[in-house]
Amino acid sequence: MSVWPWSLPEEWRARQARRALPASVRERLRHVRLGFLDRPGLGQPLALARFVALDLETTGPRMLEDCIISIGAVAVSERMVRHDDAYEALLRQDRSSAVDNILVHQIGGQEQLAGMDPAEALVGCLEFIGDSRVVAFRAEFDATVFEREVRRQLGYRAWPRFIDLAALLPAVFPGTENDTLDDWVAHFGLPPIGRHHAIADAYATAQLLMIVLEAAPRSGIETAADLRDAEQAQRWLGRRR
């Protein structure tokens, strides 16, 4: 994983990253970018939309500095969690993360050093996402880290649209006191999850999204635009408190 000196102009770093990509990765990335241009509009009914529940495990909590260790993603379409439509990758690190981080994620130093090439893993994730909307719990963190790493490793600005499940849940189920992913999992009586594992957290996010999509029409949420508006309104309310 190359680490570019951040004192240099960003566009120069991006060009260098693009030039360093193998031809096969550049071609895959070109197809993904072209496909995204044909993405469905915000008027698409929720029943027809494909969502991707995404979770990232990182080398630390600093979203502007730390790197992605692992990616877990699960598709939700036709209001079903698609267990056969998932993506998981462990990204190779230049050096293993700190011991306390390893204890949290249970991904040892040797595993980290032997992971997948980061550019390959990120292109694979973008291919899996396609033109779908990405859903994450506390999405600001995942979106910031993902977009930064795509820019650093691939030389492009990431284009997936992130929806924050932490804002959607109270928008559709007002009056609850839940805050964390574990709180919501327990609230709906879902099976306990193996926390701090990307694919496990992605499955939990997908199950909670399913519950939101089933209840959304009762709140007048019928389209992707309605879902976006409900999320944004809830985030605005959260900032006002």
Task: Name every feature range the model reports, one short phrase each.
Residues 2-41, 208-241:
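Acidic two-metal-ion nuclease catalytic site recognized across multiple nuclease folds
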